[in-house]
A protein has these predicted regions:
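Short, surface-exposed acidic/glycine-rich loop or hinge patches that mediate macromolecular interfaces
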Residues: 11, 75-76, 142, 201, ...
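Predominant activation on well-ordered alpha-helical scaffold segments within soluble catalytic domains
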Residues: 18, 149-156, 204-208, 255, ...
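Short Gly/Pro-enriched turn/cap motifs at secondary-structure boundaries
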Residues: 195-199, 227, 272-276
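A short coil-to-beta-strand element that immediately follows conserved catalytic motifs
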Residues: 29, 162-167, 219-222, 263-267, ...
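C-terminal substrate-binding/catalytic lobe of Rossmann-fold NAD(P)-dependent dehydrogenases
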Residues: 200-266
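C-terminal active-site/capping subdomain that shapes the small-molecule cofactor and substrate pocket
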Residues: 237-333
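N-terminal Rossmann-like NAD(P) cofactor-binding subdomain of oxidoreductases
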Residues: 2-191, 196-198, 217, 285-289, ...
Length: 333
């Protein structure tokens, strides 16, 4: 049984992680840390867990009693936490923030505010499963980055990312976190839509890093426009790139790339969000219009885009079945 500690357990990702782990056949939550909710029942904060657990939030962090710690902090807090606390070397870490996602060479090239030296493995199982399996520390990918990469990686494997890539993706309100803000209130978000961080989203360096790893080079720009949607969960992305291969060859390449993937699947028909919301799946579909390859990909931003993928990484790190605790039904209808 894998003994688990959770830091930052009161937010959306913390609550979703608890939901998964209390039903995980090979994991046990030892502590769920939240200074602001110390002593409160988890179900009083994450009300969807009424009747599911008697776990209480604690301010304590008994590192010596756990095998792995999940960091569910806001961005920038994980690095500071590790500088201030002595986490035993034998305890594995899975960080859901962006602090350690970029390799040192990527940090230098992009001048990102990320530590220049670290041993965190980028936790995208579709390309890094063998590295994750022996890793002590894993940096969980971003939600947009996961969805977009999984759409583009097979194309990169075929050497098709040679021209600028146009990406549009829309995300649910939970992607902004639990803390209320001007663009997360129901009265603003409902029946509304807007763009933000156009061409400057923090996940683009992650995407470029993985495409370069897969293709061997990357000279093309990733022109990414993110959208805020008026729904709670999910990301739906379109990626457009020029491609000179016939569609039959491209489809075959996508199916080959994901033939052994546990959660990412190529689908012959058009895809939609309800097929993936509440699951750890990513679905991918391609069409071709002249020399334009249109790729669509979709995920649940809190699951495959966050804690579902984190649990998948935990399973890999401890030699468990990747699907343990993650056999989830989509909202679908």
């Amino acid at each position: 049984m894998v003994k688990v500690g959770i830091l930052g357990a009161a937010g959306y990702t913390g609550g979703e992680l608890i939901r998964l782990l209390i039903n995980h056949p090979e994991a046990e939550i030892v502590f769920a840390n939240s200074e602001s909710n110390t002593g409160n029942l988890v179900a009083e904060v994450h009300e969807g867990l009424y009747g599911e657990t008697d776990l209480k939030f604690t301010a304590e962090m008994p590192f010596d009693q756990v095998d792995v710690i999940f960091f569910c902090f806001g961005h920038g807090k994980s690095e500071a936490f590790l500088k201030e606390h002595n986490v035993p070397e034998n305890v594995k870490i899975i960080d859901l923030a962006q602090d350690f996602r970029l390799a040192p060479e990527t940090v230098v090239a992009t001048q990102q505010p990320t530590p220049a030296a670290h041993d965190f493995v980028y936790g995208l199982p579709e390309i890094n499963e063998s590295k994750i399996a022996v890793a002590q520390h894993v940096a969980n990918p971003g939600c947009f980055a996961t969805c977009i990469q999984l759409g583009l990686l097979p194309a990169a494997k075929m050497g098709l990312i040679n021209s600028d890539v146009s990406v549009n993706a829309i995300t649910g309100s939970t992607g902004a976190g639990q803390k209320p803000g001007a663009t997360t209130h129901f009265s603003w978000r409902n029946n509304n839509m807007s763009i933000y961080k156009a061409f400057n989203h923090q996940h683009v360096p992650e995407i470029r890093q993985s495409l370069k790893q897969t293709q061997g080079y990357l000279d093309a720009a990733i022109d990414f426009i993110p959208y805020r949607g008026d729904f709670a969960r999910g990301i739906f992305a379109t990626e457009v790139v020029k491609a000179d291969k016939p569609i039959e060859e491209i489809v075959a390449g996508y199916k080959e790339f994901y033939k052994d993937a546990k959660f990412t699947h190529y689908v012959d028909k058009a895809i939609d969000l309800k097929q993936v919301v509440n699951t750890n799946k990513c679905l991918v579909h391609v069409d071709k219009y002249g020399d334009k390859l249109l790729i669509t990909s979709c995920i649940d931003n809190l699951l495959k885009g966050a804690v579902g993928q984190a649990v998948q990484n935990m399973n890999i790190m401890f030699g468990l079945d990747q699907t343990a605790g993650l056999r989830l039904k989509p909202s679908a209808f």
